[in-house]
Swiss-Prot record:
One GO term describing the cellular component: cytoplasm
Compartments, as annotated in UniProt: Nucleus; Cytoplasm
Stretch list, region Disordered: 1-28, 88-249, 295-318
Biased composition (Polar residues): 1-10, 171-180, 199-215
UniProt-listed InterPro entries: Elbow/Noc_ZnFinger, Tscrpt_rep_NocA-like, Znf_C2H2_type
Zinc fingers, C2H2-type class: 404-432
Major localisation: nucleus
Swiss-Prot/TrEMBL GO biological process terms: adherens junction assembly; negative regulation of DNA-templated transcription; negative regulation of homotypic cell-cell adhesion; positive regulation of cell migration; regulation of canonical Wnt signaling pathway; regulation of cell cycle; regulation of transforming growth factor beta receptor signaling pathway
Record family assignment: Belongs to the Elbow/Noc family.
Compositional bias ranges of the Low complexity kind: 19-28, 113-122, 216-227
Stated name of the protein: Zinc finger protein 703-B
Length: 531
């Protein structure tokens, strides 16, 4: 018998039963008639459940670009909807401001603005103008009249293809009203080069940010207070470049007066003269005295450089990279920077003019790929110098009263003390090598050879008959066969030198190298590009 679920019994039920009809509502809940007509609870929940908690298909799909979306409307209430909205926008280009949130959040903000922004720009105004992925045409096109308003923006300026070169005459619109900043228009040969130059409107950043001056000279802050115009005839000062001037990519390109050297008031002593004299001419084209006075107007003629005292080093100043590579920190290198013995030791201005030196003082400056010493020493130095075992510099003086110089390099710099004889120098070197057990090592060296030769030049004995004579071909490094006589802790007991002479059994053998004591510093210096 069927009964309508919530209502009373029907007439057909009364006729079939033949009994007085009893309403279904009056039946007990446990009556079999009511239990047979009940719907399962599962179906009731599926029919009457609120569908707002189900997962919307918009969560599983990328957010459409419709102006109003249910997620966007619910983003203010539900954090999950806000997260879904944020995740769906990852990787998408920024839409124009009139499309997405115009009718919801930014209608009053964007009403006063023009909606003609490009696709790659954000709706709100970006205070930082550094756009690394911006195209060339998307950089801000600001005129000279709005230069003062945008001068307080911090950030970088990306040079675009639409940047115009420096004008040949200064105009009022090209001036910048920012204090401490003068954009100087150059009327020299650097205008015609095809170097990327920054637009005048992109030079509005203040001088307080040092990274904004892309490749300007280091003293541009001191020169920014000068007058704007620099004529080619008034080149007595170093070239006063504006802080926004883009230096050429190669500082050695001919025709440029831009050269990263200190002004003429800061000179170098004799070693940089040797570097200038030893390098090919194509490395120093910008040092012409008609173009710049960085080294003074004396360099092409006399190579005279006033300035620093002899104790100073050119490594302390700014130098071109090729000169820094030529200035070797190795005391055995031919271009070692300590060249104070080129002139008299009491010179005050240290003007090392090669014409002022004696003609008997040969200056041996090899070419930059350092050749062996004997190619220069055998031809230019008298045989008396070959008896100086501790003097391995490339430039040697014949009449020097104290020819022996301690070339020990420590953390504070080279020692550079002078001695008349090699014995005094050896005694002085023992003060540097005062390590535990070092006196025992030095005492056991072959006395006939002289510990100076084995200590510094790494030269094996020439024979039992002539122990004090050195080979004619001096070498800066030891021969490749002499390294076989080093002490090997697990090898055979007594090793012999290459010439067959037995060497006393010492913990260091017959090979005592000063490089073992400061070799780590030399390798770090060579890694820095000094060697």
């Amino acid at each position: 018998m069927n009964c309508s679920p919530p209502g009373s019994c029907t007439d057909t039920e009364r006729q079939r039963s033949g009994t007085p009809a009893t309403p279904c509502a009056t039946l007990a809940p446990t009556h079999p008639l009511r239990q047979a007509n009940r719907l399962p609870i599962r179906r009731i929940k599926m029919l009457t459940a609120h569908t707002g908690h189900l997962l919307h298909p918009e969560y599983l799909q990328p957010l459409s670009s419709t102006p109003i979306s249910p997620i966007e409307l619910d983003a203010k209430k539900s954090p999950l909807a806000l997260l879904a909205q944020t995740c769906s926008q990852i990787g998408k280009p920024d839409p124009p401001p009139s499309s997405k949130l115009n009718s919801v959040t930014s209608s009053e903000k964007e009403s006063g603005r023009s909606s003609s922004l490009k696709l790659g720009e954000s709706p709100l105004e970006d205070k930082s103008s550094f756009k690394p992925y911006a195209k060339g045409g998307e950089t801000r096109k600001e005129s000279g009249s709005s230069a003062g308003g945008a001068a307080d923006k911090a950030g970088f300026r990306v040079p675009s293809g639409s940047c115009q070169p420096f004008p040949h005459a200064p105009s009022p619109s090209s001036r910048v009203s920012s204090p401490g900043q003068h954009c100087e228009s150059k009327n020299n040969e650097s205008q015609e080069k095809k170097e990327p130059e920054v637009n005048k409107s992109s030079l509005e950043t203040s001088q307080a940010n040092p990274t904004l001056t892309r490749a300007s000279i280091s003293n541009s802050s001191a020169e920014s207070s000068q007058s704007g115009d620099v004529a080619p005839s008034s080149k007595s000062d170093p070239p006063s470049l504006g802080s926004g001037h883009v230096a050429p990519i190669s500082p050695y390109k001919p025709g440029h007066s831009v050269f990263p050297l200190p002004p003429s008031g800061i000179g170098y002593h004799g070693s940089i003269v040797g570097a200038y004299a030893g390098y090919p001419s194509q490395y120093v084209p910008g040092l012409d005295h008609t173009k710049s006075s960085l080294v003074g107007n004396q360099l092409p003629g006399t190579l005279g450089l006033p300035g620093k005292p002899p104790s100073s080093s050119p490594l302390t100043g700014a130098s071109p990279p090729s000169f820094m590579q030529g200035l070797c920190r190795d005391p055995y290198c031919l271009s070692y920077h300590n060249a104070s013995h080129l002139g008299s030791s009491s010179c005050s201005t240290c003007v090392h003019d090669p014409s002022a030196l004696k003609s008997g003082y040969p200056l041996v400056y090899p070419s930059h790929p350092l050749h062996s010493v004997h190619t220069t020493l055998s031809s230019s130095v008298t045989p008396s110098l070959s008896g100086h075992p501790l003097y391995t510099y490339g430039f040697m003086l014949q009449n020097d009263p104290v020819p022996h110089i301690c070339n020990w390099v420590s953390a504070s710099g080279p020692c550079d003390k002078r001695f008349a004889t090699s014995e005094e120098l050896l005694a002085h070197l023992r003060t540097h090598t005062a390590l535990p057990g070092a006196d025992k090592l030095l005492a056991g060296y072959p006395t006939g050879l002289g510990s100076a030769a084995s200590c510094h030049l790494h030269l094996p004995p020439t024979g039992p008959g002539s122990p004090n004579t050195l080979p004619g071909s001096l070498s800066l490094r030891s021969p490749h066969t002499f390294g076989l006589s080093r002490y090997h802790p697990y090898g055979k007991g007594h090793l012999t030198a290459p010439n067959g002479l037995p060497v006393p059994s010492l913990p260091a053998g017959s090979y005592y190298s000063p490089y073992a004591l400061y070799g780590q510093r030399l390798t770090s210096a060579s890694a820095l590009g000094y060697q």
